[in-house]
Amino acid sequence: MALTYMNMALAFTVSLLGLLMYRSHLMSSLLCLEGMMLSLFVTMALTILNSNLVLASMIPIILLVFAACEAALGLSLLVMVSNTYGVDHVQNLNLLQC
């Protein structure tokens, strides 16, 4: 089981490095964030299954709900930026005003 945790930690680290290195495009940043959330979900689910915590079994589902909300907001922001400016660069996000 330690190999599974090591793989999930590696997946989280690779996603975090991708977020830090390829942060010029919004779509790349969103994909890296989704990879981080997926690795966190799998790690939390495996930890709860291994420790037999019945009361904490809803925590991974709550994490998935927040990940879905984050993805929906990120994609709506991506559509708004690409319709307004024609590109999905992250530096265009500070130009959005209400």
From Swiss-Prot:
* Family according to the record: Belongs to the complex I subunit 4L family.
The gene from which this protein is expressed is MT-ND4L
Subunit record text: Core subunit of respiratory chain NADH dehydrogenase (Complex I) which is composed of 45 different subunits.
* Top-level taxon of origin: Eukaryota
Under Gene3D superfamilies, the record lists: 1.10.287.3510
- State the EC number(s): 7.1.1.2
Cite the entry's keywords alphabetically: Electron transport, Membrane, Mitochondrion, Mitochondrion inner membrane, NAD, Respiratory chain, Translocase, Transmembrane, Transmembrane helix, Transport, Ubiquinone
Compartment(s) where it occurs, according to its Swiss-Prot or TrEMBL record: Mitochondrion inner membrane
What this protein is called in its record is: NADH-ubiquinone oxidoreductase chain 4L
